[in-house]
């Protein structure tokens, strides 16, 4: 990892013991993010996206533990930090916006007091008037009109989109360098989703923080990300710039994800879907985790885990299809000439686009 990175994760593995066995939630994951960059981690539910990001903040469930690997953020070895040290880093070095704002907020405390608590924790020595001023500043920053009046209201007075703005204000109270956004729009309707994504993107440019999105929505990825990590079975299986992953995908799982986009469906034909189910992470996975669902699987996929093969200096994929000895396969028809297909959708006013 040669860039001047703000966050570097190397060979990280996270296990969760249970009565049914040990869940290998994250398996030998490496990635890096530069200052001001936007990384999107994309994949199906249960692939390890959220647990990976919670590992970086050391907010793992009680039984979960990092069994190998290192995490370096802003020059610090996070894996060696104590809980006391982590409490000082959470909110300042990194912060998180969770999926459901209703459960992230206390229903019995006014919004203003909840934001004020976040301010006082991360900015010691402020007077009561200064804290109040900062609360109003944050509420204004995230687009909440009439902040003086609304600071006195409770979470149930707000819509889902406005609650997510309140959560975002709390997340930004400590001026973090890294913001994790864990499915921040899943609980919202489509028009509000677009507003929240646009707001985070604008704030990221204004405040210069790094953003890591956790999502299964490829439309979000296309519109906001600089780099993409495609996850499957607890691993990143393809990593590159958003243009490389969307327009030159190399892993069969990435092919399948893109092929299943409704926007690429052909009228009168059945939409593509990925058959089978994701692997159980209780078991030791042999070979390529995607092999049982992969219509292009080779014999070696069931026997030996593939390494990362470089496609370019910034693009890597964990598939035996990139081995020089592998047969040459054409991509599925749905994702051939994907750049032109997306451009046509954009020209017609479609919501899905790559900037």
Q: What annotation goes with each model-predicted range?
A:
Residues 78-95, 121, 244-249, 281-285:
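ABC ATPase NBD coupling module
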Residues 44, 58, 180-184, 188, ...:
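P-loop NTP-binding/switch modules centered on Walker-like glycine-rich loops
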Residues 65-77:
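Conserved ABC transporter NBD signature motif
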Residues 3-5, 145, 149, 241-348:
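Short catalytic/signature loops enriched in Gly
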